[in-house]
Amino acid sequence: MTMKQEYGENGIKDFLKKSLDSYLSSRQFSFKPERSLMDVETGQYIWYEKGSMIMYDLQDVMGEDRVNTGLKSFLDEFKYFEKGRYASSEDLYNALYAVTPDSLKYKVDDGFKEIVLYENRVMDAKTTALDNGKWETTFTVNSKKIYYDDTGKEKLVDEKENLVDVGLFGEDETNEDGITVKNPFYFELMWLSSGDNTFTIITDKKPLKAGIDPYNKLIDRNSDDNLKSVED
């Protein structure tokens, strides 16, 4: 991922956030039924904004090298028109699916075949100073993944566990490129159950905010509640 290599995971947050907001806004006002990424014919907000978020999420959970292996296989198979036909989105899906570990194949299906929106938010967060100078923070996040049909109607709430980032953060910083970046004290990609998930984490410094999917890697209906101030 060229942008991640150039700006880092912190620096790419603005791009992901803008892609998310553009996709959500466009789908809200579109007069056409929404198609999945695999089936879409027109609609920049799907094949560009949504597509960029899906590809970023895939390399994030299974590694950039594995995604690149799938892309190379896809390109090698269809180079020079040797197969006598142009590649399709299904061919790209198959190439990525083939290199994806079984536990993560749902990510490829969700991204290419389904219309999925998350509802992630931080419910509460409280920290306490310990005698050894460290801080113990307990916070609860709520995660919900919903499948929609092409008319925008909810058809299924996923009750299985899903991979979602959670973290504790200090005050935002400015990097050498002048970009505002997050300052994580704790950050992990976790398997979250549908509904409330509570964590107790000890950090060296006092956290100011708790977050779920704080870098907006997932397509969340309202990403503004993904961060919450930590109370004393």
Please provide the spans of the model-predicted regions.
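Hydrophobic alpha-helical and helix-loop surface patches within well-folded domains
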Residues: 1-139
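Extracellular acidic, Ser/Thr/Pro-rich low-complexity tracts
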Residues: 98-100, 143, 220
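Short acidic/polar inter-strand loop motif in beta-rich domains
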Residues: 146, 173, 214-228
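Beta-strand-rich binding/interaction modules
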Residues: 104-105, 117-192, 197-213
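Long, contiguous hydrophobic alpha-helical segments, chiefly transmembrane helices and signal peptides
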Residues: 54, 111, 164-166, 210, ...
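Short beta-strand elements
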Residues: 184-190, 221-232
